[in-house]
UniProtKB/Swiss-Prot annotation:
GO terms for cellular component: Slx1-Slx4 complex. Pfam families: Slx4. Forms a heterodimer with SLX1. Residues 39-59 are annotated as: Disordered. The keyword Metal-binding does not apply. One of its GO terms (biological process) is DNA recombination. GO terms for molecular function: 5'-flap endonuclease activity. Belongs to the SLX4 family. Regulatory subunit of the SLX1-SLX4 structure-specific endonuclease that resolves DNA secondary structures generated during DNA repair and recombination. Has endonuclease activity towards branched DNA substrates, introducing single-strand cuts in duplex DNA close to junctions with ss-DNA. It comes from the Eukaryota. This is Structure-specific endonuclease subunit SLX4.
């Protein structure tokens, strides 16, 4: 399309030039004849000439159809462009007139690529416009936020558009300031805060309006609410003892009103929790300051009905007398109390606790007749037993029957394990002439020897307490009412019920000697289906006619802290020596005595080895073999003590050991020497040198 327009434009130029020149011959048809300069003579002769009538003008010139069509197209294009420009002229921004397009097309010039020099931009700190954390924003802009108004800050935080909120708040502030200026001009204020004269006026009005109360009434209310301590504040008044509180003096001379319900009884005994728990201690002394003595109580059963007045004495920090409360490092008043008459007993006599229910309750006919007051009172008030806190403390006991120690006959407890244990007797001071035959049933393994069962029982019975368990008679019974509880079907039939009878006491002379008696074994196991007559056996075991059990001795050695022996003969020799040196009621007591024996052994012979004692006192690590050799040299009985027991005792006394593994030959020789010393000590167990 563009090429055609250019062609039509060239034709028009040629026609215009031909018409404007005078040399153009008349009769020639424009644009149909070849110009003279372009034509040859031969061509001019051959061409047919067309004559144009002279009477026709320029408008009557005939133009070819193609040229006329091109001209029409150009005119139409100009019309369209002119119309488009008229439309654009109606808008605010007028388009500039475009430059005339040259008719001759310009040559295409190759575009040169301009290579711009790349400049390295310096990194600039990027402004963080978006608030990610309110805490971080407040931390970074705390100075500017301090100046801002609180309402403006809160709205900006909630809305998130600080610019919009700032504009709104500034507009409101300007309106408020304008209103304030207008009000200030119209009604100027003289006193923003109250001055002294205004306060006096307000106080006078309040005194006129409020009801008038006398000073004595105010003091009585003050005393009723806070106590008679006007010069102290509430905290100081709460720390003062009742007898140290000083009544406030009335400024107007009027007497104060003391309410009778606030008076304290200074003669009432005061007990602390530590005094009640400790039982017998140095704190349980009579108060000599008050001189108060309680009267004996004739009827003990009326003690529960009486209410003892107890006033709590708060220890005061102003007193110089130290506190008598145990384990207390604070200073305070002495807290003492009076012992009641039924609580006061002879200190030399052993403490006797109340009778409580046990596994085998004794018959009422055989109850002892001594100490009728306590026992009758305890039985009369079986539901409300009064705990004698002045004689007994809250000790931890092994029995689950009662939290207090009880005076009762020897019984066999049935714990959760299969091993039977014997209940130790404590505080047994009086021997009873006779005891009823009591029976207890226990579940035992049918495959276990009955001698092993009673060997553990007999070993714990003291020879001086024969009234607790005189003779044991065993028989295997089957109780249909009490079914044996087993864990699985495989264990069914492997348990039997053993019935133990507590026979009447026999004289000590009737028991045969331990060495002369021959050991007899029970017929075990006995099936539960045998007849009752065939199951009953005579009295075979006593407390003196059976040798100690080997398993029991091994357990005792382990509890006490002795080394295990190879055979029973050595174990019996060690046991006899141990009983002669450390007489005790239980293995735990002998273990404590053995620790004390080691401590006394070192303290008494500390001058013989000054270097070793210096190392011990300065917490210098020593070799265990060195300490063991020293102990053996002092007393050969220490060779029988287990090494773990000695190390535990040394750890409790601050003796530090070190591991010496540098010389294995030396340790081997030491072990050999220790074995030789052990054999020598076993051979010399019954020598006079080992006597206590």
């Amino acid at each position: 399309m563009h090429d055609e327009l250019e062609k039509a434009g060239r034709h028009l130029l040629m026609v215009n030039d031909h018409l404007s020149e005078d040399s153009v011959e008349q009769g020639d048809i424009c644009m149909t004849q070849v110009p003279t300069m372009f034509s040859d003579d031969e061509d001019q002769d051959e061409e047919q000439e067309t004559e144009i009538p002279p009477e026709e003008g320029d408008d009557d010139i005939l133009i070819s159809t193609q040229v006329q069509g091109a001209i029409d197209e150009l005119n139409h294009q100009e019309t369209v462009v002119h119309t488009f420009r008229n439309v654009l002229s109606r808008f605010a921004l007028e388009t500039q007139d475009q430059a005339d397009i040259p008719l001759v097309s310009s040559k295409k010039v190759p575009v040169k690529k301009v290579i711009k020099s790349s400049k390295v931009k310096q990194p600039t700190a990027r402004l963080q416009k978006r608030i990610k954390s309110i805490t971080q924003f407040n931390t970074d802009n705390w100075e500017s936020n301090r100046v801002k108004d609180r309402a403006q800050k809160m709205i900006s935080i909630l809305s998130g558009k600080s610019a919009k909120v700032k504009k709104l708040v500034s507009k409101l502030d300007s309106e408020a300031s304008a209103d304030a200026e207008s009000l200030q001009d119209s009604h100027p204020t003289q006193f923003a805060p109250f001055n002294e004269s205004e306060w006096q006026h307000i106080v006078g009005l309040l005194r006129e309006k409020l009801p008038k109360v006398s000073r004595s009434e105010l003091n009585s209310v003050q005393q009723y609410v806070y106590g008679a301590d006007e010069q102290h504040n509430l905290w100081k008044a709460s720390q003062l003892s009742p007898e140290k509180q000083i009544s406030s003096q009335c400024s107007d001379g009027e007497s104060e009103t003391i309410l009778p319900s606030l008076t304290l009884d200074n003669n009432a005994p005061v007990y602390t929790l530590s005094q009640l728990v400790e039982g017998e201690s140095s704190n349980n002394r009579c108060s000599t300051e008050d001189g108060l003595r309680f009267k004996p109580i004739s009827n003990p059963s009326s003690v529960i009905e009486q209410e003892l007045p107890i006033s709590i004495d708060v220890p005061s920090s102003e007193t110089d007398v130290p506190s008598q409360i145990a384990d207390s490092c604070d200073s305070g008043s002495i807290i003492s109390f009076e012992e009641l008459s039924f609580m006061i007993q002879d200190k030399n006599k052993a403490d006797v606790d109340y009778d409580i229910p046990c596994y085998l309750p004794p018959d009422s006919k055989t109850l002892p007749t001594g100490e009728k007051t306590k026992r009758e009172y305890s039985r009369a008030n079986i539901n409300d037993q009064l705990i004698n806190i002045s004689q007994t403390s809250y000790d931890v006991v092994s029995s689950i029957v009662s939290p207090m120690k009880a005076q009762r006959t020897g019984t066999i407890q049935v714990p959760a394990t299969r091993t039977t244990t014997f209940q130790d007797q404590q505080q047994q001071n009086q021997q009873q002439a006779s005891k009823p035959a009591n029976v207890v049933k226990i579940y035992v393994d049918s495959n276990r020897d009955s001698n092993d069962v009673f060997a553990s029982v007999k070993g714990e019975v003291d020879t001086q307490e024969q009234e607790s368990l005189s003779t044991l008679t065993t028989s295997m019974l089957h109780d249909d009412n009490n079914e044996i509880v087993i864990d699985s079907e495989d264990e069914r039939g492997s348990y039997s019920i053993m019935e133990v009878h507590d026979a009447p006491q026999t004289h000590l002379g009737q028991f045969p000697s331990l060495r002369k008696s021959q050991s007899q074994k029970l017929k075990t196991p006995v099936s539960a289906t045998d007849s009752l007559d065939s199951q009953l056996q005579p009295a075979l075991l006593t407390t003196q006619n059976a040798s100690p059990n080997t398993a029991k001795l091994r357990r005792s050695f382990k509890v006490i802290g002795l080394k295990p022996c190879k055979n029973k003969v050595q174990m019996l020799q060690v046991w006899e020596t141990l009983e002669s040196k450390f007489p005790g009621s239980s293995d735990e007591d002998r273990s404590i005595q053995l620790k004390q024996f080691l401590t006394d052994l070192i303290v008494q012979n500390r001058d013989e080895s000054a270097l070793l004692m210096e190392q011990i006192y300065t917490f210098e690590p020593i070799r265990y073999e060195q300490l063991k050799e020293w102990l053996v040299s002092l007393n050969s009985f220490t060779e029988l003590i287990d090494d773990s027991f000695i190390k535990n005792w040394a750890d409790l006394n601050g003796i530090v050991f070190r591991n010496d593994t540098e010389n294995p030959l030396l340790s081997q020789s030491q072990s050999q020497s220790q074995s030789r010393l052990l054999s020598q000590s076993l051979s010399q167990l019954q020598s006079p040198s080992l006597s206590p």
